[in-house]
Amino acid sequence: MRIKPETEQLKQAFQNLAENESFKETNERLKNGEEPHDMVKTMAMSEHVLKAMLALGDEVYPGGSLPRQLKELIILNSSIQNSCQFCTKSHIDITKGLGISDDPEAFVSERDKLNDCDQAALAYQDAIIADSNRVSQETISRLRIHFSESEIVELTFLIGYINMLNWFNNALGVEYRGELAP
């Protein structure tokens, strides 16, 4: 990790968020003498960033209206494409823990085994990642078969959100060490 979190700064950041449900697990880890995973530790170096992450998470992931399985598919697809070790490995563990797939990497790569809805979402995501200025009307039309306008907005935001987290983790050398393994 390229950023070295300071213990006192971490404790203060998490104490300020002690009542927040999203950080319940992290606060339990701290009480037990354990540390939070590196992404949260890194974000806690700026309490503003940690609060922003919390707000986005509450509304988009794990919050939001899209099915959790679809969210994990989107997260894994972006994370693999962006070579984000933290997000890829942690969401492989999360996907296994939720019982979504025993082989999450195949879950993403074997697209012909996915339903039409998931295939449309991944095609849209791939188009955004390739060049967000060139998403075709055909891709949008295919998406509209399965998603409402509101869901398309949420899906687009989720795609941007996970890409931002991938870039954050990659740039700062944040690594996953199995903290979320089932």
Residue ranges and their predicted role:
Residues 103-116:
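Acidic/His metal-coordination segments adjacent to aromatic residues that form catalytic metal sites
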Residues 30, 48-53, 83-87, 129-137:
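Short acidic alpha-helix initiation/capping motifs at coil-to-helix transition points
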Residues 1-65, 182:
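Secretory/endomembrane lumenal or extracellular ectodomains immediately following the signal peptide
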Residues 71, 78-98, 102:
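Conserved alpha-helical segments that form or flank metal/cofactor-binding pockets of metalloenzymes
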Residues 43, 57, 73-78, 108, ...:
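Short alpha-helical scaffolding segments that buttress acidic/His motifs in well-ordered protein cores
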Residues 149-175, 180-182:
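Preference for long, well-ordered alpha-helical segments
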Residues 117-157:
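Acidic/histidine-rich alpha-helical segments that form the ligand environment
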Residues 63-73:
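Amphipathic alpha-helical hairpins
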